[in-house]
Structure formats: structure tokens, C-alpha cells
């Protein structure tokens, strides 16, 4: 029965992807019906904020994005620092320590939601609502706006205006869908209140303080925006965030909704729907491979316990919630790292070595399907690399969407693809070379190495999940992961926007018999191969020293 539920969940991922992709294309390309509904409200916002409707260059678009995001980081930083003297603080929580406030503000603006604090004890209701929830809307709206400009550039059209795209992302996508999802979560038993904690009497007569808050609205945008940060420190393992299997499936659907829809949006906007389908199917195959790998490993259980003759028919249940089970915990772990959300319904630090390898690889590749917007930018980056390699092998100038891929584009892409592993491996080496980093490791040996690399991989990929055995709430970890999150977020977005702007200016080359098509199964295979080979070449040595070595040791 559990496998039937898994298949149904997978089918739901597939069934909602195309309709959502069509809606996104209409939402950002000026559908008359949507303009009638949302247009008056949006024009009022533009009038109040002084936004003028004009097309920006890629530099203007990128500058607008960085300045607005930077302003939000500063505002929210001071909210965290001053929350102790601000209203909506029934628990009288003190202001955040400076480096933790720095890390948290960047974390949520970068759509990472890495949490070096426990949500219910570290933030007031004001900080949760005005600081955290506000950024949970603003961060994915930023990247969804940018990916629309990116696709327009690939299609040879004007990039548009960042502030208009940002507003449309909020009014037409995130606010309405999150509102409806929050109502469903309330129906499933997720609390939504501004009242303080409830004191309850336990069976043995002791008193217990039960924390609550505006959880349903928080969880809705947490999953829809691929944010991932928990209202509670236990994240989606907490019964108030994720009461049962229905809420669990809805959370996974929300995580996958926009990342899986964007290939279809892309296909419609560039005038090649088949290419969008090829990208979707290719990535879904990689996703399935990851799910099968982690599930098989978790169901086989801990090799060390197997060697002792201990039977555990449910697989490795350490760190998992009984109400979700091993299979759905594995699916959730695959979804949350494939969609770069970072929410967890099981503790990733307790996964088997090969089970923990799958989330790690998903974040290292950062393309299957990746987070809202940012992931799709990486997908096209790998697609262009696949085209470039194919062109070199047959001695032709590579072409993508009828545009020649030349030195300028490949230099930008080369720098971008190297920057991600440089952040991960460089900062991991720094942490391992100083006691400021190694003192936080709770496990010696191979697992300890994986803890460190996982933290920086999660930060660079803007995922936010962690091997929570790491004691990361220290100035060293707060500052270094904050820098990795900021650089990992904005560097690739800006460089790939420059690539799209460069391609926009090029004339379309007429298609000939020798043109390498990017809308067939051959390209899909080369595309998958490029992702796997580039990822393996870059990160394989670390994976051998970490989870693979741990697995062989346990065997």
C-alpha cells in the first residue's frame, strides 16, 4: 500500500507541473484575464512605490535585484537584533546575537533558511511574521522574477523590469497559492494563532508548556517558496508543522510545484515546447534514481546492525518519524534537496552513509530541479555546456536556440560552474584546518567530514538543511556560512543573466541538417551525462572520503 501512495504522489508531481508552467507563462507575459484581476492592485503598488514601466538592461536588472535584497537584509537584521524591545513577543525572547542575526538575515533573503537557532525559542512572533515570513515571500519572488528575465533573454526578447516581475511574482503566484495552501494546512490540524504558549497537564500530573503560533501560513510559503526554514526547531518532524501523511504529501507537492513547472514555462516562452518536456523528463529520471538509491539504502538498514544479526524489517528507523515511515521519509529527503528547499521530516545526520549521500549529491549538482528560479538557471547552464561539448565533438560551432555559443558565453559559464564547488570545498577546507571549525564536529572520522561539507554544500546551494549533529551556532560558522549563502545566491544569478543578455543580441542562425537538436532524447541523454560527469569529476574525491568511506567502514 505504501508503494501505491508513493506512485500516486509521483503522479501528482507530474500532473500539476504542466498546468502550473502554463499559468506562470501567462502570469508574466501579460494575460488579459490575469491583468484584469491583478492589474489594478499592481498599478496601485507601482504608483505608491514610484515604479515606472520600462525595460531594463541586464546590469540595471541585476543592480535593482541586489539593492532591493540588500535593503531587506539590513531591515530584517535590525528586527532580529531589537526583537527583545519590539511588540508581539509574549515569550519575552531577547534580541539575537550579532553574528547569528547576520547569518539568519542573509539565510532567509538567500532562500536558504539555514537555521543556527531553534525557531520557537529564538524568534518573537514579530520576527517570525515581519522578518522571516516576509523574506520567505521576497526571496523566491526575486529568483522567479529573474528567471523570467533570463528566459526572455534566451528567447531574444527584452529582459523586462525587475520591480514589475517581482511584484507579479508576489501578487500572481506566491500570495494566492500560499493563502489557499495555508487554509488546507489548518484543515489538516496545523495551528494558526497569535496567542502565546498553552500550559497543559501531563498524565503524571506535571505541567508542560506547549508552544504554538501562526504556523500554517508559515509552512505554506516555507514549502511553496522552497524556503525550508522551520517555525519550530524540529522543522517538519514537529507534529504542529506536519501532523500526518496528508500534510506530508501536500508539503512535497508545494516544494516541487514551481521547480517542475519552469521547464514547461521555458518551452512555451522560447517557442519550443518539446525542449521543455525533454528537460523535465531528463531531470525526473535523475530524481527517480536518487529516490531509488536512498530508499534502498534506508530499507536495507544500518550495515553495522545487520552484521550483528539484528533484524529491522522497517529499515533504518533512526531519526525518522513513525507516522511517515522509512519510504516517505526517504522521498521527502529526496524532494527537499532536489527542489533545494531544506525542510526535513527526518534527521539527515542519522541517514545511512549512502542514504545521506543522495541529499548531498542533489545539492552539489543543484539542478534536479533546483530551487524556484535559481535551479532553472543552473539547468540551462548545464544544457548549454552539453550543447558546447557536442558541438566540439562534431567540429561545429555550438548553437542553442538558434544562437551561436561563443567565447564570451562560455567564459561566463565556466566561471559560474567553478564557483559553486570552490565555495563548498574552499570553505570546508578552511573549517577543517582550524579549531574554530573542528570544535563543532560531533563525530570523528568520515562522518565528521561529511557534516562539515554538508553544511557548506547546503549553504552554497541555498538549501538550508543540515547534518544537525554539527554545533554550528558559533561566530565562525555564522559568518562563514553567511558569506557562502550570499555569494552562492547572487554570483550565479548575475553571471547567467549576463549570458542571457549576450544571447539576446545575437541573430538566429537558420536551422540546417547538421544542426544539433536540443528537443530530442539524444540531447536528453547528453544533458544527463553532462550533469553526472561534471558533478562526479568535481565532487567525487570528497564523496569517496566522506559517505562512501563511511559505508565501506560499516560494511
UniProtKB/Swiss-Prot annotation:
Give the top-rank taxon of the lineage listed in the UniProt record for this protein: Bacteria
Which Pfam families does UniProt cross-reference here?
KdpA
Question: Where does the chain cross the membrane?
Answer: 2-22, 60-80, 130-150, 173-193, 246-266, 278-298, 374-394, 412-432, 483-503, 525-545
A single GO cellular-component term on record: plasma membrane
Keywords, A to Z? Cell membrane, Ion transport, Membrane, Potassium, Potassium transport, Transmembrane, Transmembrane helix, Transport
Q: Transmembrane among the record's keywords?
A: yes
Q: Which InterPro entries match?
A: KdpA
Question: Recorded GO terms, molecular function?
Answer: P-type potassium transmembrane transporter activity; potassium ion binding
Topological relation to the membrane, as annotated: Multi-pass membrane protein
Q: Record's NCBIfam families?
A: kdpA
Task: Name the protein family.
Answer: Belongs to the KdpA family.
HAMAP family, per the entry: KdpA (MF_00275)
Q: What is the purpose of this protein?
A: Part of the high-affinity ATP-driven potassium transport (or Kdp) system, which catalyzes the hydrolysis of ATP coupled with the electrogenic transport of potassium into the cytoplasm. This subunit binds the extracellular potassium ions and delivers the ions to the membrane domain of KdpB through an intramembrane tunnel.
Q: How does it assemble?
A: The system is composed of three essential subunits: KdpA, KdpB and KdpC.
Name recorded for this polypeptide: Potassium-transporting ATPase potassium-binding subunit
The gene for this chain is kdpA
